[in-house]
Design a protein with these regions (language model features):
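Ankyrin repeat (ANK) tandem arrays and their immediately adjacent linkers/low-complexity segments
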Residues: 1-203
Length: 203
């Protein structure tokens, strides 16, 4: 067992080492270098680049680099791999939407939503699975948008989430979405949280 663990660590560091060039490019904001690297190494698009298991998609999302994220999506080998790429989770359990949700990049979220709809329509389950996915704390992307005070993002994502909305209303420690909005003094979002609650209850 110990040997297996050591071999696993070696493989992980070997993978990260191979992606050192785009990682350093990301640190320096050299997004064209990242684009160029993955144009030549498309099979590594979903490989982890950091010790926290961030892929290029995570990095593009939380760096608020819409053009880079669009470029990476277009480099995917086929449209059916889109869900897999966006659903890949890092150490914190965050997928790409969890990372986009913490920014004010509504246009980025809109691009991803439309891309998913274009690929999988009329089946909306792939999009819904991504929006309802919970990270290690039990947070959905909508919950994270509220927690980070991203009013427009929270509204946009909630408008595109269908079915049961209750999964967005709390996390593992029982902190409600309304409570987190008030604690962060995101009062506009506390109003949105009320609206979501009313929508859930059909009020």
């Amino acid at each position: 067992m110990e040997r297996d663990l050591e071999e696993g660590k070696e493989k992980k560091w070997e993978t990260i080492s191979r992606l050192r060039k785009p990682y350093l490019a990301a640190l320096g904001g050299q997004w064209d270098v990242m684009k160029s690297f993955f144009e030549k190494n498309r099979k590594q698009l979903c490989f982890q680049m950091t010790v926290e298991k961030d892929t290029a998609f995570h990095i593009a999302a939380y760096s608020e680099e819409k053009d880079l994220l669009q470029h990476l999506v277009e480099l995917l080998p086929d449209s059916s791999s889109l869900f897999e790429a966006l659903n890949k989770k890092n150490t914190h359990g965050n997928n790409t939407f969890h990372e986009v949700a913490t920014t004010d990049g509504v246009e980025t979220a809109e691009f991803l939503v439309k891309k998913l709809q274009g690929v999988y329509r009329p089946d909306e389950r792939k999009l819904e699975d991504l929006l309802k996915a919970k990270n290690n704390l039990g947070e959905t992307p909508i919950y994270r948008a509220v927690a980070h005070g991203q009013t427009k993002m929270a509204k946009y994502l909630s408008d595109h989430s269908c079915g049961d909305l209750s999964s967005h209303f709390g996390r593992k420690d029982k902190m409600s979405i309304l409570h987190i909005a008030v604690i962060g003094q995101h009062f506009g979002l506390s109003d949105l949280s009320y609206c979501l609650t009313f929508k859930l209850l059909n009020i």
